[in-house]
């Protein structure tokens, strides 16, 4: 069975798009808003609106560097929208992120911005750089009670990494005032991908430890107590990873990486959904977190279903289902990294690399049965190779942004390649990327066999 989607080639708009992680949401006006990112020093991220009823795609900002009031001929671009996109009182909120990951650009980077977008007028609001020279990697969320934004600010410059660390910041929506709530962790650099802000205004989060191991953090859950104005750490409370479909233990070596790799609030913000899959401890279940239940005993964490390995490729329809994308075979899903295998030549792919769209009920009393909506193909029968940005609504619309095999040079990504990127993918255990990503000169662009596409399907 196939799941046929309608896809749009984004590299026909900007040649430099080369990937997208997070940065997609459905809004109250029925549209899907999303970012398109690049590692090129010649262009920043773009911001789009897609209306599913008419399939109309609108470019809201071709280069977020300009929205931020910066000149990419003088400073590195704001190359990514890597954050969640959240909505409050008719506004969307998102953050920019550094994408030129080499020393000269890192040292010249101005810092990540928090951006608002008003749905009714199309007006942008720039809250400015949160902390000079620091990026936001990558969480943002809103306290709808007290009208505050929270972001996770991360150092990249060597001196800042050595002498400082990551910070939790709060922004007042009305005034734009920024408050540094403290370093998290107290020592070392951490990353945080998702927040959950509950109905009391408390901000809950974990630290993503795959890039930068933190020996002091093994399955910790953090809480900013809004009434006390203090950050609390619940040590070692995150569940130990188990594998689908029968609960076999995840590899012991992954235990130190336990963290939320995806999280979304349930209606009313009393609870949230979360996963701790690929690069997050290896757990293969969908969970509900309820902060009103006992955290230390584990009672606050309730498993819903075994879904298999996932990373960012999940979407909650804000009603009763979670959609997710993964390889057909569960063992392949936990073994192969699509961010790497998307650049493999076909003869080096010795597994079924067809991605499937699946879904599961969010009802804890349901049977946890997975619906496989089929192999994802588009209207022109392209092959899809990576999805790490998704959204869904309660009308059966599912939206995806990812990498597909290009059928022409116009569809292909003109991607920026530098040695540290190749080293990173090789160190992860995927040296075959060198066959397609190798370039004769370091720091240069290369036309790839894949391109970036936005895709939409209605599952109802």
Q: Predicted regions span which residues?
A:
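Blade-loop segments of beta-propeller domains
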Residues: 20, 45, 54-99, 128-138
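Repeated scaffold domains used in trafficking and secretory/extracellular systems
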Residues: 18-23, 67-84, 133-141, 187-197, ...
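Blade-level signature of beta-propeller repeat domains, shared across WD40, Kelch, NHL, RCC1
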Residues: 384-460
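Short, conserved, GDST-rich strand-edge loop motifs in beta-rich repeat architectures
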Residues: 37-45, 94-111, 152-165, 207-219, ...
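Loop/turn-rich, solvent-exposed surfaces of beta-rich toroidal or solenoidal domains
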Residues: 262, 274-277, 305-362
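Conserved beta-propeller blade signature
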Residues: 32-35, 92-93, 148-151, 203-206, ...
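Residue-level detector of Asp-centered blade-edge/turn motifs that repeat once per structural unit
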Residues: 26-29, 87-89, 142-146, 197-200, ...
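Beta-strand-rich domains and repeat architectures in extracellular enzymes and scaffolds
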Residues: 9-45
């Amino acid at each position: 069975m196939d799941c046929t989607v309608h896809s749009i080639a984004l590299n026909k708009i900007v040649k430099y798009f080369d990937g997208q992680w997070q940065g997609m949401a459905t809004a109250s006006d029925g549209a899907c808003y999303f970012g398109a990112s690049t590692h090129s020093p010649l262009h920043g991220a773009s911001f789009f609106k897609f209306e599913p009823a008419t399939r109309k795609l609108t470019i809201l900002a071709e280069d977020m560097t300009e929205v931020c009031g910066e000149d990419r001929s003088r400073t590195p671009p704001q190359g990514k929208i890597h954050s969640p996109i959240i909505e409050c009182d008719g506004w969307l909120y998102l953050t920019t992120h550094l994408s030129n990951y080499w020393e000269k650009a890192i040292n010249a980077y101005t810092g990540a911005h928090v951006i608002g977008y008003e749905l009714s007028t199309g007006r942008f609001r720039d809250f400015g750089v949160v902390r000079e020279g620091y990026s936001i990697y990558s969480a943002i969320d809103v306290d709808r009670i007290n009208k505050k934004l929270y972001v996770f600010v991360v150092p990249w410059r060597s001196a800042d990494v050595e002498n400082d660390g990551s910070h939790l910041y709060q922004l007042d929506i009305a005034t734009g005032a920024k408050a540094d709530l403290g370093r998290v962790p107290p020592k070392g650099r951490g990353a945080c991908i998702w927040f959950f802000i509950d109905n009391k205004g408390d901000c809950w989060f974990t630290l993503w430890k795959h890039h930068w191991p933190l020996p002091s953090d093994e399955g910790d859950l953090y809480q900013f107590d809004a009434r006390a104005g203090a950050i609390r750490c619940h040590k070692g409370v995150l569940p130990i990873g188990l594998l689908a479909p029968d609960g076999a233990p995840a590899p012991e070596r992954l235990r130190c990486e336990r963290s939320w790799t995806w999280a979304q609030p349930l209606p009313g913000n009393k609870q949230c959904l979360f996963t701790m899959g690929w690069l997050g401890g290896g757990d293969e279940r969908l969970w509900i977190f309820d902060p009103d239940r006992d955290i230390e005993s584990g009672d606050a964490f309730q498993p819903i279903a075994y879904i298999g390995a996932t990373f960012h490729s999940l979407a909650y329809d804000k009603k009763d289902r979670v959609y997710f994308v993964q390889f057909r075979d569960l063992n392949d899903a936990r073994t192969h990294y699509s961010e790497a295998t998307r650049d493999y030549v076909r003869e080096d792919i010795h597994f079924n690399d067809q991605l499937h769209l699946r879904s599961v009920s969010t009802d804890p009393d349901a049977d946890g049965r997975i619906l496989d909506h089929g192999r994802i193909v588009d209207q022109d029968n392209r092959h899809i190779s990576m999805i790490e940005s998704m959204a869904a609504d309660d009308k059966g619309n599912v939206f995806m942004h990812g990498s597909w095999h290009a059928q022409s040079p116009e569809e292909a990504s003109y991607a920026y390649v530098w040695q540290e990127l190749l080293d990173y993918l090789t160190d992860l255990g995927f040296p075959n990327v060198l066959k397609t990503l190798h370039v004769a000169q370091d720091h240069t662009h290369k036309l790839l066999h894949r391109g970036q596409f936005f895709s939409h399907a209605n599952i109802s």
